[in-house]
Amino acid sequence: MMYRPDVVRARKRVCWEPWVIGLVIFISLIVLAVCIGLTVHYVRYNQKKTYNYYSTLSFTTDKLYAEFGREASNNFTEMSQRLESMVKNAFYKSPLREEFVKSQVIKFSQQKHGVLAHMLLICRFHSTEDPETVDKIVQLVLHEKLQDAVGPPKVDPHSVKIKKINKTETDSYLNHCCGTRRSKTLGQSLRIVGGTEVEEGEWPWQASLQWDGSHRCGATLINATWLVSAAHCFTTYKNPARWTASFGVTIKPSKMKRGLRRIIVHEKYKHPSHDYDISLAELSSPVPYTNAVHRVCLPDASYEFQPGDVMFVTGFGALKNDGYSQNHLRQAQVTLIDATTCNEPQAYNDAITPRMLCAGSLEGKTDACQGDSGGPLVSSDARDIWYLAGIVSWGDECAKPNKPGVYTRVTALRDWITSKTGI
């Protein structure tokens, strides 16, 4: 059989007339121009600009100023939440519902006939809007809609004043408030043992305590000059001159460093017992508050965190039992466990005292580990303000079933902190 290749037939070449080619190009250019025009129109009319305002509002209340004038107290939080809700409702009942982002009380000050609330107000308007017109509309909405606000407290709508501020000023005000942090959606985090690294500004109160330059424990910034940590961190290493505190999401390089002026260990702490496991460290000089470094809120002694509350523990500790500390800060989402469950025989068999709390998972999924000691266990309130609930203290290895992490209960020792620091 002879090999027979396929017959390839020549195709007739089709040539377009020049006017057809020109028409196709012309139509293509028109379509491209329309697409570009629509894109520019969309960007121009849909891009939004953030407007930040410093606002003041007068009000009267039956409560004494001393009851809510102290930042982060239960009464401060309650009063702030009421006023923020009033402002939110004012915008939600106006045509500016979609433009309103948030309001936040940053402090209160006394007046001769009442109290002045100092607030930050954040809105977003289309970039094509006239800035002066925006300012007038925001002021008008507050004046008109706050007249319908139902107290207590009783607000004076005509007292509202707003002043436009830039992002740097806004950040500065927020950074000087306790318990604020970078806005970030908190998904399900794994334990610090193999957990997730965090970004700058997520947990700005976290500190690393280092002895002769080596990380030993975590700590929490509670004001510009004081850290709170665990007492057992200083059992062997007592000389403050050899300790340093670093801040930021990495130990090396750090965002900033400070030496320690003095260390205060609770008088009732007796090693190797875990009870009263709390200490304070005074920094050699104050730290400036920034987006990356600022303080957590301390809860009132009377505040009660509830079993089942979702909390976060952070630290530079090991990824496994008897492992090495990490250079990058990690986080773990844990759940508060009631003391009765934690004191059961299969758990800690009545070893949990009123100065302790348990958090984690009875299945052993989440936990802190070596090197996390002294670090923060924090919980947020309805205003998304974060409070120090516990201090990493002890546990049976790391992430073992029925052996959740044990933390020093901050509310139980809140008065001791005040007695030593005035905070």
UniProtKB/Swiss-Prot annotation:
Expression can only be detected in tissues derived from the head and neck, and in skin, prostate and testis. Residues 41-423 are extracellular. Pfam families: SEA, Trypsin. Serine protease which possesses both gelatinolytic and caseinolytic activities. Shows a preference for Arg in the P1 position. Its EC number is 3.4.21.-. N-glycosylated. It is a single-pass type II membrane protein. Residues 192-422 form the Peptidase S1 domain. SMART domains: Tryp_SPc. GO terms for cellular component: extracellular region; plasma membrane. It is found in: Cell membrane. It comes from the Eukaryota. It is an enzyme of class 3 (hydrolase). GO terms for molecular function: serine-type endopeptidase activity; serine-type peptidase activity. The gene is TMPRSS11E. It comes from Homo sapiens. Residues 49-167 form the SEA domain. SUPFAM superfamilies: SEA domain, Trypsin-like serine proteases. Keywords: Cell membrane, Disulfide bond, Glycoprotein, Hydrolase, Membrane, Protease, Secreted, Serine protease, Signal-anchor, Transmembrane, Transmembrane helix, Zymogen. Forms a heterodimer with SERPINA5 and SERPINE1. Its main location: membrane. This is Transmembrane protease serine 11E.
